[in-house]
Amino acid sequence: MKKIIAILMAAAMLFALVACGTEPVVTDEPTEEATEATEQATEAVEEVKVMSYDEFVAAELQSEVVVETYVQAKQSWWEKDGVGVATFYTQNEDGAYFLYEMPCSKDDFDNKLTAGAKIRVTGFKAEWAGEVEIIDAKYELLEGNYVAEAIDLTDKLGTDELASYQNRFAAFKGMTVEKVEYKNGEPGDDIYVTFGYNGASYDFCVEAYLTGADTEVYKAVGALTAGDVVDVEGFAYWYEGINTHITKVTPVDEK
């Protein structure tokens, strides 16, 4: 009897030792489901939230903004602190964005950031003298093309509603020239033009960095005299009020 008990106890101890020495097998290989979930999470993190125009308008000043827009026109390219920059007038179907001194290569400026080119812009919303703009901007070229037609804002002159069209490509019809003067008093720099409409005066500008002295519009505006009536096209820039950057003037024949 004692022998049987001893044998049983030895067997039990052997079983316990075997059990204690056995460890579960752990694999380092992730399952297909786990890999797919990780990839989806990474894509979600990398996905950029692009703002609508209304969201851009509602954004706080100095906050980061991301918009998709189309180049409409551009001022001269130059180097600032060794970095190439240019200022762009851009617009999509819902509104316009003024990109101030956005860094870009000369090659991109000449060959890619052309009228109609679609870009995604990341920068910071800022304001200067009433002009809302995007500064410290970076861009990504996208597929797509859009060139805006001038929207007639003549009936918006003198209204608070005009500001909601800021920076858009616009037309103002039947404007009477009151005064034309050159910045610094001589041709080559900006031209300041005061127009009258419905008893009020509005200061527009030929921006030399946009349309220089060798352009048709610069010469045409320089030849205007007080009393001339013209239709005007340009970008509804803002400087303490509407200060359209003129791109075209067309004389209105008196009847």
Describe these PLM feature segments.
Residues M1-L8:
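Positively charged n-region of N-terminal signal peptides that target proteins for export
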Residues A11-A12:
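Repetitive helical segments and hydrophobic/amphipathic motifs
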Residues A16-A19:
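C-terminal motif of bacterial Sec signal peptides marking the signal peptidase cleavage site
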Residues G21-E23:
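Bacterial signal peptide processing site
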Residues V25-V26, L157:
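Hydrophobic/aromatic hotspots within intrinsically disordered, low-complexity regions
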Residues T27-E46:
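Intrinsically disordered, low-complexity serine/threonine-rich repeat tracts
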Residues A41-K255:
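OB-fold single-stranded nucleic acid-binding module
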